[in-house]
């Protein structure tokens, strides 16, 4: 017999070498859908301890972008890893469906409500548009490999959810947190509505920067406060502002009570300025000569009166801690209707909350003859002319500064006092309770798993400062497409009906049946009878942040699959500290006195490879749809997992290419395992641990160590650590050591020998573990691998838990982990010498080499213990150990202390079956071409292996 190929155990598997993910994944998704994979998982996990990750609803408008993909993939990785850790972790995806962006889209399509279509018809169109957007986004999320109840997502426009949002507000009313007031709120003239904090973005804007004189009503009284009896000209307190248009609403000038102010004589007048800012004011006003006449603390000037620069009234000096020396003059123009700080200090002094600006951003009639009807930003120059005419303008220049803008229109917004409904931060202690909950979440996390409840830990300080400093929450909106506030107020007093919470429940029951339109269709006589004549509906809708912020109640508490469990985790982008995390915290504490979550995980924004924000104009946008169509969902998932999400997440074609390279290494490892498990039946062929070759037990132990570290990384949400450990296992421990060494034994040993079955047993255990490590991240590939693994098993890897069949070497054994770690280093040194010899054309491959290891006594003892099997570890045809002192001159010194490596050509000729060189080829007449080892493997009992 001259062709021995048929006697080899060559690797064989149907598992393809190429992932071809973009083509293969859609078919897998179809299979998952047809089999009801999500339902199978839920049944398998029934009765397990629960872990609830509550989905923050994306807005139902437009296609998903790379940031959406990051968010959904991170959630999916956590849900799947929790399943492997023995949790029942249902995932109900959701969408935010009401609000202005959808209104604006529908307006573009059919016009404003009340024009061609009634408000009721307009709402129906909004509902239909939102449903269409949900369908498009849902298809993309499913394509990412995200498992969830996609057949039954939650939508904030579901009738039941709309009703529960009203019930949430009723509970907050009942708990005494709601109040009405004319407070200044962010107002977008383009939207014609107030905006939430989270709907405000900041962009650079050029504004006029002006210093304005307010002249003292009683000059002598003011001079006396500075200890001055006389001075030349008027006495003027100087304010600085970048919003001249707000001056018609000025009702005071604020000073800091503790700051020192100076009375400064300049040509023809005296100016009152903060002492530390005198020089900077003089410099910008171009005043070269001045004299300080006197000084006093701000508090000395309290309630002195000064003339408004162009309106026919005077205003008081008031004290405010918000006054700083960061810029300006130390005196702050105060318009309580146009600024939160101004409003707060104005309340203290009982100032009028003047709001001369309409909802369209134009001055109301009766403001001022030259200003009435003008758009405020166009009025700045006219106000400056008024100041010039009255002699009140000290200085004007242009200033580029960061200015609040509407997130939708990107246009500058204003603060505008309008009658609105607010959740009070302090009336019932909501602020202090919320801050206490923020603390508790951190402590509870540290107590339970030594991991802060705020992940990363800096998230705590961020939300803490936001809650500590935030104003009362304006929850009312003047929109058409939104959940109604569903309250009734007395026509004369504007007080809420005394049975408000009871009436809101009656409305909620109607909304549950017919949606929010039921409120607008409702005749309040049906609720109040004869009393109806005294009451009217509150026409406002709720801020959409109230919709999404109340979902722990309106969705999680309501859905049966959550079994009454409250959410364990909220996970969103870092912008949500002031968005969903905050609104959810406020509502839950206002309703129940506790936070809605136990952990809050935040991820960074996506940027391009150079760290730049993605923008269509720059042309650096990475589309998740294109990535999936070109590379596949698993590559996108691997990029997400391998990137540290705690800061900005860089993505580009080059970065994704690196992810594809890493994917190939993992896939190749999985394929090698499957190909070499060909013909292995775990029921019949498994070798007991005590009978296995030592190296095989070491490999299983490596997998056990890797698994412990991988599970810990999953539990700490360190997914990039999972990927790094997975890569180290596949590339280093397996790829460049174990899998390399076992090829000879796996291919050439007798098919059913212990030597080969021991190796296959190790590969089987490793494959069972590896497929589970992969599953949360490389979900498509793990499912594919699962289908090729030998033995009876559940239909899907996603119903399983971490593999429990791993074991390792005993530390007391001679050939323990430390022994093999040392051998890894020795092999590395030998490989270096062989590589050099190949470059020098001394040998063609490692099997042409005979290696002599010159070792010190301790190392020699270790190496000798492998006996003749040392050569299999080194993958050479011969290997011997000699004392270090006998090292020849050509032996290569190594980086290992006590080792030199000698290399020569292997004696004998090459065996055509195993490719090892042997001097004993031809000793068996029946197989004259084979070495003795191959003869016993082909025709005898098969070789024995103990160590390698």
From Swiss-Prot:
A motif ('KMSKS' region) lies at residues 613-617. GO terms for molecular function: aminoacyl-tRNA deacylase activity; ATP binding; isoleucine-tRNA ligase activity; tRNA binding; zinc ion binding. Catalyzes the attachment of isoleucine to tRNA(Ile). As IleRS can inadvertently accommodate and process structurally similar amino acids such as valine, to avoid such errors it has two additional distinct tRNA(Ile)-dependent editing activities. One activity is designated as 'pretransfer' editing and involves the hydrolysis of activated Val-AMP. The other activity is designated 'posttransfer' editing and involves deacylation of mischarged Val-tRNA(Ile). Pfam families: Anticodon_1, tRNA-synt_1, zf-FPG_IleRS. It is found in: Cytoplasm. It is an enzyme of class 6 (ligase). Keywords: Aminoacyl-tRNA synthetase, ATP-binding, Cytoplasm, Ligase, Metal-binding, Nucleotide-binding, Protein biosynthesis, Zinc. Its cofactor is Zn(2+). One of its GO terms (cellular component) is cytosol. Belongs to the class-I aminoacyl-tRNA synthetase family. IleS type 1 subfamily. ATP binds at residue 616. Its EC number is 6.1.1.5. InterPro entries: aa-tRNA-synth_I_CS, aa-tRNA-synth_Ia, Anticodon_Ile_BEm, Ile-tRNA-ligase, Ile-tRNA-ligase_type1, Ile-tRNA_ligase, M/V/L/I-tRNA-synth_anticd-bd, Rossmann-like_a/b/a_fold. Disulfide bonds: none annotated. Monomer. PANTHER family: ISOLEUCINE--TRNA LIGASE, MITOCHONDRIAL, SOLEUCYL-TRNA SYNTHETASE. Zn(2+) binds at residues 911, 914, 931, 934. GO terms for biological process: isoleucyl-tRNA aminoacylation. L-isoleucyl-5'-AMP binds at residue 572. This is Isoleucine--tRNA ligase. IleRS has two distinct active sites: one for aminoacylation and one for editing. The misactivated valine is translocated from the active site to the editing site, which sterically excludes the correctly activated isoleucine. The single editing site contains two valyl binding pockets, one specific for each substrate (Val-AMP or Val-tRNA(Ile)). A motif ('HIGH' region) lies at residues 58-68. It catalyses: tRNA(Ile) + L-isoleucine + ATP = L-isoleucyl-tRNA(Ile) + AMP + diphosphate. Binds 1 zinc ion per subunit.
């Amino acid at each position: 017999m001259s062709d021995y190929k048929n006697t080899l155990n060559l690797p064989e598997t149907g598992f393809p070498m190429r992932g071809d993910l973009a083509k293969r994944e859609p078919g897998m998704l179809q299979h998952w859908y047809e089999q009801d994979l999500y339902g199978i998982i839920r049944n398998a996990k029934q009765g397990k301890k629960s872990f609830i990750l509550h989905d923050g609803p994306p807005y139902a408008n437009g296609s998903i972008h790379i940031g959406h993909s990051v968010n959904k993939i991170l959630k999916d990785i956590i849900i799947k890893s929790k399943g492997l850790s023995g949790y029942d972790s249902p995932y109900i995806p959701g969408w935010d469906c009401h609000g202005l962006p959808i209104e604006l889209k529908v307006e573009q399509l059919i016009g404003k409500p009340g024009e061609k279509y009634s408000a009721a018809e307009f709402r129906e169109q909004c509902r239909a548009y939102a449903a269409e957007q949900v369908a498009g986004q849902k298809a993309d999320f499913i394509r990412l490999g995200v498992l969830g109840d996609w057949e039954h997502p939650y939508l904030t426009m579901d009738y039941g959810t709309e009703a529960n949002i009203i019930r949430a507000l009723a509970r907050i009313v009942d708990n005494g947190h709601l109040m009405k007031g004319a407070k200044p709120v962010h107002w977008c003239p383009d939207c014609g509505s107030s905006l939430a904090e989270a709907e405000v973005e900041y962009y650079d804007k050029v504004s006029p920067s002006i210093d304005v004189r307010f002249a003292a009503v009683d000059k002598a009284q003011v001079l006396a406060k500075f200890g001055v009896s006389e001075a030349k000209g008027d006495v003027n307190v100087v304010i600085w502002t970048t919003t001249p248009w707000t001056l018609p609403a000025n009702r005071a000038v604020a000073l800091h009570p503790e700051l020192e102010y100076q009375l400064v004589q300049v040509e023809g007048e005296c100016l009152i300025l903060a002492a530390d800012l005198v020089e900077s004011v003089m410099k910008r006003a171009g005043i070269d000569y001045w004299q300080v006449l006197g000084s006093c603390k701000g508090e000395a000037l309290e309630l002195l009166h000064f003339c408004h620069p162009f309106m026919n009234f005077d205003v008081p000096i008031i004290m405010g801690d918000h006054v700083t020396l960061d810029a300006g003059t130390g005196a702050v123009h105060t318009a309580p209707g146009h600024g939160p700080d101004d409003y707060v200090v104005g309340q203290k002094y009982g100032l009028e909350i003047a709001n001369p600006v309409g909802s369209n951003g134009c001055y109301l009639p009766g403001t001022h003859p030259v200003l009435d009807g003008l758009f405020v930003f166009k009025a700045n120059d006219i106000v400056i002319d008024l100041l010039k005419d009255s002699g009140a303008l000290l200085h004007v220049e242009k200033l580029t500064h960061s200015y609040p803008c509407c997130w939708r229109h990107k246009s500058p917004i204003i603060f505008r006092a309008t009658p609105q409904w607010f959740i009070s931060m302090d009336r019932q202690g909501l602020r202090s309770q919320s801050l206490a909950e923020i603390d508790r979440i951190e402590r509870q996390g540290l107590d339970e798993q030594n991991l802060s409840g705020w992940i990363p830990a800096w998230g705590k300080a961020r939300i803490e400062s936001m809650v500590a400093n935030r104003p009362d929450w304006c929850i009312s909106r003047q929109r058409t497409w939104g959940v109604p506030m569903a309250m009734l107020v007395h026509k004369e007093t504007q007080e809420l009906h005394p049975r408000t919470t009871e009436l809101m429940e009656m409305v909620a029951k109607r909304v549950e049946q017919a949606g929010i339109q039921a409120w607008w269709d409702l005749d309040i006589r049906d609720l109040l009878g004869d009393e109806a004549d005294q009451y009217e509906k509150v026409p406002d809708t709720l801020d959409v942040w109230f919709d999404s912020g109340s979902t722990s109640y309106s969705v999680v508490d309501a859905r049966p699959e959550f079994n009454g469990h409250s959410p364990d985790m909220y996970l969103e982008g870092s912008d949500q500290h002031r968005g969903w995390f905050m609104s959810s915290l406020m509502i839950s504490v206002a309703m129940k006195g506790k936070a809605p979550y136990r952990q809050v995980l935040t991820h960074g924004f996506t940027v391009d490879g150079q760290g730049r924000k993605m923008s269509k104009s720059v042309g650096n946008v990475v589309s998740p749809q294109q990535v999936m169509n070109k590379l596949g969902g698993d590559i996108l998932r691997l990029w997400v997992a391998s990137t540290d999400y705690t800061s900005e997440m860089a993505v580009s074609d080059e970065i994704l290419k690196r992810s594809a390279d890493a994917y190939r290494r993992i896939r190749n490892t999985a394929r090698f395992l499957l190909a070499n498990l060909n013909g292995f039946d775990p029921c019949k062929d498994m070798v007991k641990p005590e009978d296995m070759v030592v190296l095989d037990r070491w490999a299983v132990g490596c997998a056990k160590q890797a698994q412990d570290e991988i599970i810990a990384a999953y539990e700490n949400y360190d997914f990039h650590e999972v990927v790094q450990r997975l890569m180290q296992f596949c590339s280093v421990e397996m790829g460049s050591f174990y899998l390399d060494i076992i090829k000879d034994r796996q291919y050439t040993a007798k098919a059913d020998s212990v030597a080969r079955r021991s190796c296959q047993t190790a590969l089987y255990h490793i494959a069972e573990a590896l497929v589970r490590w992969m599953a949360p991240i490389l979900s498509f590939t793990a499912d594919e691998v699962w289908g090729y693994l030998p033995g009876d098993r559940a239909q899907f890897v996603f119903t399983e838990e971490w593999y429990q069949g791993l074991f390792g070497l005993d530390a007391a054994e001679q050939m323990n982990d430390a022994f093999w770690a040392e051998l890894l280093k020795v092999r590395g040194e030998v490989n270096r010498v062989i590589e050099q010899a190949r470059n020098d054309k001394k040998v063609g491959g490692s099997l042409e080499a005979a290696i002599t290891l010159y070792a010190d006594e301790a190392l020699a003892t270790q190496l000798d213990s492998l006996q003749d099997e040392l050569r299999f570890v080194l993958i050479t045809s011969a290997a011997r150990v000699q004392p270090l002192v006998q090292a020849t001159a050509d032996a290569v010194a190594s980086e290992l202390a006590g080792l030199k490596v000698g290399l020569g050509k292997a004696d004998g000729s090459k065996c055509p079956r195993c490719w090892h060189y042997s001097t004993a080829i031809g000793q068996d007449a029946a197989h004259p071409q084979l070495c003795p080892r191959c003869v016993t493997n082909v025709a005898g009992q098969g070789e024995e292996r103990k160590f390698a």
